């Protein structure tokens, strides 16, 4: 007979909370930095795009003449607000001495919001990029002439804003991946 005589085998002692929280704290730090990048880049997207204006003789090109550019600015403003709020909350949790992993409900809310905003920003950036392509190359089917040779400053600023918006998409997508990790790494018993 064994030393336990049919009794349940002893369970391994749980690892220390400090060791368990180290990867989560490291991910929280990465999330904090990614959200800061999203905040800064969203500010730049908005600032550069709203200054995308140019007048040549009697003609003018302005960012708010296009619904795609207006949508990009609006989505960037929403992402800016959300990312700033998440940055503040992440910084608070990181600096807190009694730091705990977020609840499953909170993890779901973060995951869903991160997914929605990442895809919204991707869609707005893609629509703006398509408009910029047409502005640069024209469209023979629609008989639209390219305008970037005339409105070079406008096109350069709009293009810079679009490139920045794709950088924001990358930061948001990585934040979303971290949110997914926080949500789906949990055992099914923790609620």
Curated annotation (Swiss-Prot):
Residues 1-25, 90-114, 179-191 are cytoplasmic. InterPro entries: CASP/CASPL, CASP_dom. It holds the Pfam family CASP_dom. One of its GO terms (cellular component) is plasma membrane. Its main location: membrane. It is found in: Cell membrane. Glycans are attached at residue 137. Keywords: Cell membrane, Glycoprotein, Membrane, Transmembrane, Transmembrane helix. It is a multi-pass membrane protein. The chain crosses the membrane at residues 26-46, 69-89, 115-135, 158-178. Residues 47-68, 136-157 are extracellular. Belongs to the Casparian strip membrane proteins (CASP) family. Homodimer and heterodimers. This is CASP-like protein 2U3.
């Amino acid at each position: 007979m064994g030393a336990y005589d049919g009794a349940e085998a002893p369970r391994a002692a749980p690892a220390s909370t400090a060791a368990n929280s180290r990867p989560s704290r490291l991910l929280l730090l990465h999330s904090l930095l990614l959200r800061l990048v999203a905040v800064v880049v969203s500010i730049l997207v908005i600032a550069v795009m709203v200054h995308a204006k140019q007048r040549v003789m009697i003609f003018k090109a302005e960012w708010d003449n296009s619904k795609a550019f207006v949508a990009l600015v609006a989505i960037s403003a929403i992402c800016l607000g959300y990312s700033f709020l998440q940055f503040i909350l992440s910084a608070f949790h990181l600096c807190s001495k009694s730091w705990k992993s977020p609840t499953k409900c909170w993890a779901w809310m973060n995951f869903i919001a991160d997914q929605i905003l990442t895809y919204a920003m991707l869609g707005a950036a893609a629509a703006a990029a398509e408009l910029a392509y047409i502005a640069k190359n024209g469209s023979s089917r629609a008989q639209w002439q390219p305008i970037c040779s005339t409105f070079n400053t406008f096109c350069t600023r709009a293009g810079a804003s679009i490139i920045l918006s794709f950088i924001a998409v990358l930061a948001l997508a990585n934040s979303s991946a971290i949110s997914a990790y926080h949500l789906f790494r949990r055992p099914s018993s923790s609620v």
